From Swiss-Prot:
Record's keyword terms, sorted: Chloroplast, Membrane, NAD, NADP, Plastid, Plastoquinone, Quinone, Thylakoid, Translocase, Transmembrane, Transmembrane helix, Transport
Origin species: Oenothera biennis (German evening primrose)
Biological process per Gene Ontology, one example term: photosynthesis, light reaction
Protein name: NAD(P)H-quinone oxidoreductase subunit 3, chloroplastic
Gene that this polypeptide is encoded by: ndhC
Lineage, top ranks: Eukaryota, Viridiplantae, Streptophyta, Embryophyta, Tracheophyta
Gene3D superfamilies: NADH:ubiquinone/plastoquinone oxidoreductase, chain 3
Enzyme Commission identifier(s): 7.1.1.-
Gene Ontology MF term list: NADH dehydrogenase (ubiquinone) activity; quinone binding
Amino acid sequence: MFLLYEYDIFWAFLIISSVIPILAFRISGLLAPTSIGPEKLSSYESGIEPMGDAWLQFRIRYYMFALVFVVFDVETIFLYPWALSFDILGVSVFIEALIFVLILVLGLVYAWRKGALEWS
């Protein structure tokens, strides 16, 4: 039988950890002075008057390179706990991790063939 009273501490922690940031934002919004002037509406560029237009276009290669980096960074985050408990988990988890790595290698090969890793 599933007993919910065993999770009282979890629910209390979840509610408190959700209410505290919401209250902090609400209270700071109520207490903070609000004055809108021309200084506040201008763009900020390292303490200097902005030069030119604030709109800059970036090449899509930067985004593709960053996306591939994030994918493999997340892979490292998922594989680290698995590597620490490798001797306890058994063969089935090893096969699942192998499938996970193979899917990521296929993604790397696809990104490589599409030219996402070339910087020229």
